Amino acid sequence: MSVLSGILKTFVGDKSKKDLKGLYPLVDKIHQATQVLSELSHDELRAKTLEFKQHIAEIRKPLYDEINEVKSRIEALSDVDEKESLYAEIDRITTQAHDEVAAYLDNILPEAFAVVKETAKRFKDNEQLVVTATPFDRTLSAIKSNVKIKSDKALWANSWDAVGKPVTWDMVHYDVQLVGGIVLHQGKIAEMQT
């Protein structure tokens, strides 16, 4: 069987190599987006995540409104067959919402991954990041020792206690880790051999 596999690889090629070859253009886009994001302030970089979330909410809102309208029509009905057709309509709208959000996530993948990579770089290069405090920062500061609030600023330390052991962030994502993240985003299984 291994002889046959070798012959097939010679003529057809190695599937994993082909798959990887298709992912590296996305990795290049992540690097390009990271360069652009490196010019942003800490607050501007954080705002990118909110921008992503708001756009997802904008995609979902009209569809969820439509689902709620269909649900209210269902409540007014007693005919089981009519209800069944409306439940099928809800399923169709839910699938549409999922598909539209998935398309948006695929579209922003390079920039979203770049936000994470740039954030990791900033934590690696700085002992502390100072940002405008948000309600989330205030909540986290009550339970996490590496987040402090001073006036209207949140101070995020790059080291913290993990089960009694001090840990300092010292990593920026390698290309192979970006590839692994892309593969997982695509719903595939990835085995990291690093």
What are these regions (language model features)?
Residues 16-193:
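Conserved pre-motif I regulatory segment
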Residues 1-16, 20:
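A conserved P-loop NTPase coupling/switch region
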